[in-house]
Amino acid sequence: MLVLTRKSGQRISIGDDIVLHVLEIKGTQVRIGVDAPRGVGVHRFEVYQRIQAENQSAASMDQDVLSGAAGLFEQLNLKKTK
């Protein structure tokens, strides 16, 4: 792990496309701004962990549940086309 020391107003570059801005340091809190391409996900770590857990849960969902949901969508689409 690379550890850097920065003061308020200074920046850190990650690759060619990502820049971290140290906006404010107040006590034990640091406000950071992130400039990144639109396609790059930027999340607080605890939010990222929840997203990963939800993705794993969805990927391991019971096949019968998925088939039932697909059947409901088919029924809804048939009603719309009538």
UniProtKB/Swiss-Prot annotation:
Oxidoreductase in keyword set: no
Alphabetized UniProt keyword annotations: Bacterial flagellum biogenesis, Cytoplasm, Repressor, RNA-binding, Translation regulation
GO biological process: bacterial-type flagellum organization; mRNA catabolic process; negative regulation of translational initiation; regulation of bacterial-type flagellum assembly; regulation of carbohydrate metabolic process
MF-aspect GO terms: mRNA 5'-UTR binding
GO terms under cellular component: cytosol
UniProt main location, coarse: cytoplasm
Compartments it resides in: Cytoplasm
Superkingdom, natural source: Bacteria
One of the Pfam families matching this protein, by short name: CsrA
Cross-referenced Gene3D superfamilies: Translational regulator CsrA
Self-association state and partner proteins as the record states: Homodimer; the beta-strands of each monomer intercalate to form a hydrophobic core, while the alpha-helices form wings that extend away from the core.
Database matches in HAMAP family: CsrA (MF_00167)
Task of the protein: A translational regulator that binds mRNA to regulate translation initiation and/or mRNA stability. Usually binds in the 5'-UTR at or near the Shine-Dalgarno sequence preventing ribosome-binding, thus repressing translation. Its main target seems to be the major flagellin gene, while its function is anatagonized by FliW.
Family: Belongs to the CsrA/RsmA family.
Name of the protein in question: Translational regulator CsrA
Species for this entry: Desulfatibacillum aliphaticivorans
Lineage start: Bacteria, Pseudomonadati, Thermodesulfobacteriota, Desulfobacteria, Desulfobacterales
Gene designation per UniProt: csrA
